[in-house]
Amino acid sequence: MLKMESTQQMVSSIINTSFEAAVVAATSTLELMGIQYDYNEIFTRVKSKFDYVMDDSGVKNNLLGKAATIDQALNGKFGSTIRNRNWMTDSKTVAKLDEDVNKLRMILSSKGIDQKMRVLNACFSVKRIPGKSSSVIKCTRLMKDKIERGEVEVDDSFVDEKMEIDTIDWKARYDQLEKRFESLKQRVNEKYNSWVQKSKERNENMYSLQNVISQQQNQIADLQQYCNKLEADLQSKISSLVSSVEWYLRSMELSDDVKTDIEQQLNSIDAINPINAIDDLESLIRNLIQDYDRTFLMLKGLVRQCNYECTYE
């Protein structure tokens, strides 16, 4: 007879599919939040946590055990099914279930889910109506049993009491956001005003520097104009000096060779560049002094040859 394990295979497939769904949900959430992630790292972390929860809670073994029992019943082995039925009705099993329920109650209490909330959740359920904002409140079998046992009372003072629920003070939140916006606006304005003030100071410094540069340029232009005037005056004086010396030279009783030599030196004077002209005049004066010195020495020698003595008074 062929052994059937289709139920166990289906349960294993559902568990594996649940794990894949958990990985897809985790990666999709990270993508929507704009968080970069490593797929292999997410896969490893989710698998480790998923395997731990499924094994530690006993859910995986419970599902596989029940699937194995169903497969055994399908294969004609009812012994395990009978044992499971007896186990479910055993007093120890009931005590264990009570213990688990009490443990779950304490866990819920530690999480902030008090007795009132647990009882209300057990007695009522809410059914949403598609296309409408209203809902239908349904009573559970526990609520029906409590009504039959007379455990439901009507509290008239409840109408005047305010339900203790968590509400959002939108006005306070709006005021808080408005304060934050005003603070941010003030900081932006301060930064903008500071930037404008610095820009004004830079512009003022630039304009002041431009004025100083303009004044200096005007002064330089004035000095250049004055220097040009001085240079023109010097050129005029030098030309006048050369002309005067030439005229004076022609009126003197000197030999033509001497006059020609002096005129050549006068014509060689640079009348355009005053600095060169001064150097030329210096050279001319030195030559004249040197010629005078030679002439005096010649005269002194001639006097001595005539048996005369030269004296200076």
Swiss-Prot record:
Homodimer. Interacts (via the coiled-coil region) with host ZC3H7B (via LD motif). Interacts with host EIF4G1. Residues 208-313 are annotated as: Interaction with host EIF4G1. Its main location: host cell. It comes from the Viruses. Residues 166-237 form a coiled coil. It is found in: Host cytoplasm. HAMAP family: ROTA_A_NSP3, ROTA_NSP3. Residues 150-206 are annotated as: Dimerization. GO terms for molecular function: RNA binding. This is Non-structural protein 3. InterPro entries: NSP3_N_rotavirus, NSP3_sf, Rotavirus_NSP3. Residues 170-234 are annotated as: Interaction with host ZC3H7B. Belongs to the rotavirus NSP3 family. Residues 1-149 are annotated as: RNA-binding. The lineage of its organism: Viruses, Riboviria, Orthornavirae, Duplornaviricota, Resentoviricetes. One of its GO terms (biological process) is regulation of translation. One of its GO terms (cellular component) is host cell cytoplasm. SUPFAM superfamilies: NSP3 homodimer (SSF69903), Rotavirus nonstructural proteins (SSF58030). Plays an important role in stimulating the translation of viral mRNAs. These mRNAs are capped but not polyadenylated, instead terminating in a conserved sequence 'GACC' at the 3' that is recognized by NSP3, which competes with host PABPC1 for EIF4G1 binding. The interaction between NSP3 and host EIF4G1 stabilizes the EIF4E-EIF4G1 interaction, thereby facilitating the initiation of capped mRNA translation. Keywords: Coiled coil, Host cytoplasm, Host-virus interaction, RNA-binding, Translation regulation. Disulfide bonds: none annotated.
